[in-house]
A protein has these predicted regions:
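Hydrophobic/aromatic-lined pockets within catalytic cores
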Residues: 76-80, 105, 142, 163, ...
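Short acidic/histidine-centered micro-motifs embedded in hydrophobic/aromatic stretches
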Residues: 100-103, 115, 160, 205-209
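GST superfamily/GST-like fold recognition
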Residues: 149-173, 181-188, 193, 203
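Non-globular targeting/processing and membrane-anchoring segments
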Residues: 135-136, 163-168, 189-231
Length: 231
C-alpha cells in the first residue's frame, strides 16, 4: 500500500462495514483487522479507542480516528479526488447529508437492532419508534434514486448497511420491523440498490450472516435484554 491505512473492525458489524464500503468506493487500499469485540475488548481496540472502546477505528499513518460517520467524512476529505464523493460538493446538500446521516444514527440504528433482539414492552416500544423514524427517513428519499439524488453517498451507505443487517435479523427472530406495506419507499430503494450491486457487492454473504444470527440468537438476545431490559 502507498499509505498506511488500517481498519479495526468486525465482519459482523454494520458500523464497521460502513467504513469498509467507504474506503472501497474511494479506491483506498487498506488492511482489515477483524476483531472479536462482542464478548470482550481486544487490547488493540483499547489501545486505539480508549474512550469509547468501540469499533470501527481507522488508523492512518498510525493515528486513530473513531466513530463511523467521522471516519467516513475523514476518508472523503483525505482522498477528495479518488473514487466517488461520499458527501456532496454543494454546501447546502452537504449539510443535509450530514443531517440525515446523524438523524439515522441517533434515531434508527439502535432501535432497529433493539426491535429485533429485545423482548416485551421494550421491543414494542422500539418497534413503534423504528416505524416512525424510518417513515421520516423515507421523506428524505421520496422522489429520488438515492438519498443524495442521482449518486450514492454517505446516507445511502449507512442506511443500507443497517437495513441489510436488520432484514436478516428480523427473519431469524420472526419480527416484522421492515416491510413493503410499512415502508414502500425504503424497500423499493433497498431492492433497486441491491439489484444495482453498487453496495450489495460489499456486503457479507446473506447466508453467512443468517447462519451466525441463527446460531447465536439466544446469546445476542440475552446480551441485548441484559443491557436494555425487556420492560
Amino acid at each position: 500500500m502507498d499509505e498506511e491505512v488500517k481498519l479495526l473492525g468486525s465482519w459482523l458489524s454494520p458500523m464497521s462495514r460502513r467504513v469498509e464500503v467507504g474506503l472501497k468506493l474511494k479506491g483506498v487500499s487498506f488492511e482489515f483487522s477483524d476483531l472479536d469485540v462482542f464478548f470482550s475488548k481486544p487490547p488493540e481496540l483499547l489501545q486505539h479507542n480508549p474512550v469509547h472502546k468501540k469499533i470501527p477505528v481507522l488508523l492512518h499513518h498510525g493515528k486513530p480516528i473513531a466513530e463511523s460517520l467521522i471516519i467516513l467524512e475523514y476518508i472523503d476529505e483525505t482522498w477528495p479526488n479518488s473514487g466517488i464523493r461520499l458527501l456532496p460538493k454543494d454546501p447546502y446538500e452537504r449539510a443535509m447529508a450530514r443531517f440525515w446521516a446523524k438523524f439515522f444514527d441517533d434515531k434508527c440504528s439502535l432501535t432497529l437492532w433493539m426491535s429485533c433482539w429485545t423482548e416485551g414492552d421494550k421491543q414494542q416500544q422500539t418497534l413503534a419508534e423504528s416505524k416512525l423514524n424510518l417513515t421520516t427517513m423515507e421523506g428524505a428519499l421520496k422522489g429520488k434514486k438515492f438519498f443524495g439524488g442521482d449518486e450514492i453517498g454517505i446516507v445511502d451507505i449507512i442506511v443500507f448497511c443497517s437495513v441489510y443487517w436488520a432484514e436478516i435479523a428480523q427473519e431469524v427472530v420472526g419480527v416484522d420491523v421492515i416491510n413493503e406495506d410499512k415502508h414502500p419507499i425504503l424497500c423499493k430503494w433497498m431492492k433497486e440498490t441491491v439489484d444495482s450491486k453498487v453496495l450489495k457487492d460489499y456486503m457479507p454473504p446473506r447466508e453467512k450472516l443468517f447462519c451466525h444470527f441463527q446460531t447465536y440468537k439466544d446469546a445476542i438476545a440475552a446480551l441485548m435484554n441484559a443491557r436494555f431490559g425487556s420492560n
